[in-house]
Structure formats: C-alpha cells, structure tokens
Design a protein with these regions (language model features):
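Accessory interaction regions appended to the cores of large information-processing enzymes
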Residues: 1-356
C-alpha cells in the first residue's frame, strides 16, 4: 500500500487486561489501536527500515451455509457488515449463488460461521439466519423421442396459431444446455419463425419439466409443422415449441443429475478405516490412497456435493481435529432413484414410470 499509519500507543494483552507499554521489542506480541489503513495481512514498518513479509498462506474455506436476514430490509446492512468482517478475517467469504437464488457464507468450520452470526448481531445489530444450502442439480434425457406442439387461440380478430413437430435426444455434452437444429423441408414452417422456436427451447431449459432444475445435454431438432398466413406469430411458435419440449422431455426417460466433487482427505494412518467407511456411507467412491511426505495418508474419492454438507465437523470428530480435506467440482452424474423420490412429487414419478 505504501501508506502512512500513525501509532500513538502500544499495548500488551494479559487476559482481559490491556496494559500500555513504552515499546515493543523483536519477538514481543503486542497490540495497537485505531489503525486507519492497516488490514489483516499487512506489514507495519519504519520508512527508514522497511520490512515486507510474505502474506501468510490462508486456508481455503470449504464449510458453507446459506444465510438470510431475519428482518426484511436488513440486507444492505448485512452486506456492508460482512464486507468489514472479511477485511479482518481472510478465511471468511461470501458467495452470491445466482443460479439457486441464495447467498452463501464460507468459513473454516461450523463454529466460525456461528461466531460470525453472533458478531453480526452483537456488533452490527443485524440478525442473520443460517440454513442448509441448495445444491446445483440438473435435468437431462436418456433416449430420442419425437413430440408435436400445437398452440391455437382464437379470441375475436386475429388469433394465434403455431404448430411444430420436434425431436429431442441426448447431445452427449452435459456442459451445454441445448443444441438446436432445424430440418424443415418445403417451407412447412417459415424461416422467420425458427428463432422463436429456439427461444421456446431455451426458456424451457432454464427450468426443466422434471423438478424445476436447469436442463443440460439435450439436442432439439425442428422437423416439421404448419402455419397460418394471418394468425401465426413468433409468440405462437414459441408456445408451440414449449408444448413440444415439455411433452418430449417427459417421454424421453428424464433423469436428475447431481453434482459430484473430487475430494482429497489427509489423515494419519490410524484414522483411514473410519474415514473411508464414512465416505462410503456418504455415497462416496474411494479412488485411491497414498502417503504424503509427512507420513499421512491422502485418500482420493468422488462424492456427491450434497453429502459434503457438515463433513468438516464430522471429519474433525473422527480424527480428533487433525484431519484435513479439500474438494472441487468434478462433474454431474445420474442421481439414484432414492434421491429422485425425495425431489419429485408422486404425480411426476408416476408420469416418468408410465413412459419407461
């Protein structure tokens, strides 16, 4: 920063007592007050003898909870309060998850998050509620189908008419929501309506018919249709494509995809049995294990993201606070039928089974 900081007094702390001292020598642990520009991680030194230390390595926060204001209208206060707290604590992080419409508070462990909420109430007078986060599930299909979509509305004057026949199949690319193609011959659907048909597909992919999650890995092809020279419109063809999509999707063996994380767990050898057993109970798949240069065991596994909720606390309990872990998103895979039952209504499950 190369900024000047004026320090009037220095102190040492002994329990709850703050004792003013004339100086602090090398090796002393002391305190200063009313710093205007200094933040956590900064180095304070004399201009005549500048000393710059490397910033300390900060542990990556993996524990997170969904948070929300208990009182409507406190959102701005909470945002500014958390910004100040993150300047003090570099392991604290806030993420705005727009996809799932939630705000996430990250920290090193559950206790840190609870202390943060307590500080928000005590210091900044804002009350925050923590809850289990939502996870980024996806929807896709397993087989190719053809489906019609016909939208017709007459209410005096010009009506609305759009008629399409489409095919839907897996694209093989779960990173992309959809691929759109058209194979219409003979002008059955005028070209100027193709973008409206694609728009209908695009909007359907943002909230899938199965459980309301985003759709991925689908190829939609416009095959045929019909139009009316007066009543047809872009809106009518978009609605027709929407009807075709919803019917075709539910006929094409739809499945729910859950996010999978690649996890590395570092523990002393004596805890490996308990840790691996716990990973299996969390529907994890252990990929391998090897020793690091400190003599500890590194367990690598794939595990559903939803099963990592609360893992930090459980790992510390199993290993006496010694175990460490890190993870990153790997891919999405088909969720087991038991999870599907928890996510879907009876009516939707019955509709899926009827098409198997």
């Amino acid at each position: 920063k190369d900024a000047e900081e004026k320090i009037a007094k220095v102190y040492v702390l002994r329990g709850k007592d703050v004792i003013e001292v004339p100086e602090l020598k090398a090796g002393d642990i002391g305190a200063v007050a009313k710093l205007s520009v200094t933040q956590t991680g900064d180095t304070i030194a004399l201009r005549s003898a500048p000393i710059v230390y490397h910033k300390p390595k900060i542990s990556t926060p993996y524990t997170y909870m969904r948070f929300a204001a208990k009182t409507k209208g406190d959102e701005d206060k909470i945002s500014s309060a958390l910004a100040r707290m993150m300047e003090e604590d570099l392991t604290l992080r806030v993420v705005n998850d727009t996809e799932n419409r939630q705000s996430l508070l990250y920290g090193i462990g559950d206790q840190q998050l609870e202390v943060t909420v307590s500080k928000l109430l005590g210091r900044y007078k804002v009350d925050v509620e923590l809850s289990k986060p939502k996870f980024a599930f996806r929807e896709t299909i397993r087989r190719k189908v053809e489906a019609p979509g016909r939208y017709k509305k007459q209410s005096g004057g010009h009506g609305q008419f759009g008629d399409v026949k489409m095919s839907f199949e897996p694209s093989g690319d779960l990173e992309t929501p959809y691929i759109f193609e058209e194979k219409v011959f003979g002008g059955a659907v005028p070209k100027n309506y193709f973008p409206a048909v694609e728009k209908g597909v695009q909007e359907c992919c943002t909230k899938g018919p199965l459980a309301g999650y985003p759709v991925v890995g689908i190829k939609a092809t416009l095959l045929d249709g019909s139009y009316h020279p007066v009543d047809s419109s872009e809106m009518a063809f978009k609605m027709a494509a929407t009807l075709a999509f919803k019917k075709g999707f539910m006929d094409a063996n739809p499945v729910l995809l859950e996010p999978i994380a690649s996890v590395k767990v570092v523990v002393p050898d004596k805890f490996t049995g308990d840790v691996m057993g716990d990973l299996n109970r969390r529907r994890g798949r252990v990929l391998g294990m090897n020793s690091d240069h400190h003599g500890k065991q590194v367990i690598e596994a794939d595990i559903p993201m939803s099963e990592l909720f609360g893992y930090n606390t459980d790992l510390r309990s199993m290993t006496g606070g010694i175990g460490l872990y890190e993870y990153e998103f790997s891919r999405s895979v088909e969720a087991p039928i038991t999870l599907l039952y928890r996510k879907l209504s009876f009516q939707i499950i019955a509709a899926i089974v009827s098409h198997l």
